Amino acid sequence: LPERDIRRVYAETVGKFQSDAMLYCEEHWLDKGPPPTVDARGMSDGTLRFLAILTALLTRPQYSLLVIEEVDNGLHPSRAKLLLDMLKTVGAARGVDVLVTTHNPALLDAMGTQMVPFITVANRDPATGHSVLTLLEDIAQLPKLLAQGPIGRLSSQGLIEKSIANEQRADTTRWVL
């Protein structure tokens, strides 16, 4: 998203038959004169994706579920908190539950510890190859891990996955004994 405010987003029909639409936004860059207008071809992939997610969130039926794969794909890391705040605020106001996936450490860091109860880690069971989902708050070593740094950094360093693997090995050993 641009560093300055987007003042207005709108679409107009275009083309020979007026059957296509073009997205436009007005950005507040100058203190004088009309704001510059940028069409979709001049917007970054991250801006377009952010606007698409916001549109989906605003148009979902109330009390529904919105699932977004790689929610931050194409988005500048500095905008991670803005994206999270929007998803939480607009989702709560509209009664829309939001389920997202990410591999982005910046987004995980922006979640902070207050989101721990809502974070699930997916990894593979080495014995079966199946995906295993683990609630972050169910990791026994989580307090020690969080003392070492934010969630994104822990994930980047492989510490969360390593802790889960250690717990899985310990569970397997208990079953064998």
Show which residues each predicted segment covers:
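A broad, low-specificity signal for short, low-complexity segments enriched in glycine/proline
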Residues: T59-R60, A80-L84
